[in-house]
């Protein structure tokens, strides 16, 4: 079946393959200005701990080239700028221009200049040379990608041999009681918060649905192997609400 006739998930809705990217873009154009505030409210600030653990496992050193993919408002990119120093380079990349503008303004105001570039790009066809980056991170972005397999293969292509990919993403809770509570919170509280803070309940309804449609821990692990990564492992956080997958290129 050609992509023109294929459908894919947009939350719980099936949409034509080529329309998902436009719909996801609409979501993030809508929420970009309040994205950081909503992250703090939705996760009770815990997203900062998840990201801190991701940075700690990145293995980034001075002089490295780092790609923060789907980097949005730049939480990870800011830390990486400090870690690589002026000898290194960080590229903050996002497919969404609104998110990228918020990230650029935020990091510039924090004094992050000289060793960072901002690139609007699609994860499925990254505009970077082969074997270029020492480390790639994608934080809460992979589930929004239409062709995840193609995106993972693209990441593997631009990663240097010896480099690592870190995928921080919502996943499947491993504790049954937590799963029930999490479902109630996701489908009721998140759209309510979205309506109050951003006047956009539908975007946060999509967020809850997109999490449920994202591959579970073991499935994503195998997808990373299939894309060319080795020694893939994952760490559950907060009972599996979030998982950090790490894969290496040799």
UniProtKB/Swiss-Prot annotation:
Query: Which SUPFAM superfamilies does UniProt cross-reference here?
Result: S-adenosyl-L-methionine-dependent methyltransferases
Species per Swiss-Prot/TrEMBL record = Francisella tularensis subsp. tularensis (strain WY96-3418)
Judging by the UniProt lineage, the source's domain of life is Bacteria
List GO BP terms, alphabetically.
aerobic respiration; menaquinone biosynthetic process; methylation
Q: Does the keyword Plastid apply?
A: no
Q: In which pathway does this enzyme or protein participate?
A: Quinol/quinone metabolism; menaquinone biosynthesis; menaquinol from 1,4-dihydroxy-2-naphthoate: step 2/2; Cofactor biosynthesis; ubiquinone biosynthesis
Q: Which gene encodes it?
A: ubiE
Protein's UniProt name: Ubiquinone/menaquinone biosynthesis C-methyltransferase UbiE
Gene3D superfamilies for this protein: Vaccinia Virus protein VP39 (3.40.50.150)
- Coiled coil region boundaries: none
Q: Name one Pfam family in it.
A: Ubie_methyltran
Q: What is its EC number?
A: 2.1.1.163, 2.1.1.201
Which reactions appear under catalytic activity for this entry?
A: a 2-demethylmenaquinol + S-adenosyl-L-methionine = a menaquinol + S-adenosyl-L-homocysteine + H(+); a 2-methoxy-6-(all-trans-polyprenyl)benzene-1,4-diol + S-adenosyl-L-methionine = a 5-methoxy-2-methyl-3-(all-trans-polyprenyl)benzene-1,4-diol + S-adenosyl-L-homocysteine + H(+)
What this chain does, per the record? Methyltransferase required for the conversion of demethylmenaquinol (DMKH2) to menaquinol (MKH2) and the conversion of 2-polyprenyl-6-methoxy-1,4-benzoquinol (DDMQH2) to 2-polyprenyl-3-methyl-6-methoxy-1,4-benzoquinol (DMQH2).
Q: Is Membrane set as a keyword in this record? A: no
Spell out the family assignment given in the record's similarity comment. Answer: Belongs to the class I-like SAM-binding methyltransferase superfamily. MenG/UbiE family.
Q: A single Gene Ontology molecular function, please?
A: demethylmenaquinone methyltransferase activity
Keyword terms:
Menaquinone biosynthesis, Methyltransferase, S-adenosyl-L-methionine, Transferase, Ubiquinone biosynthesis
What InterPro entries does the entry give? SAM-dependent_MTases_sf (IPR029063), UbiE/COQ5_MeTrFase (IPR004033), UbiE/COQ5_MeTrFase_CS (IPR023576)
Positions with a binding annotation for S-adenosyl-L-methionine:
73, 94, 122-123, 139
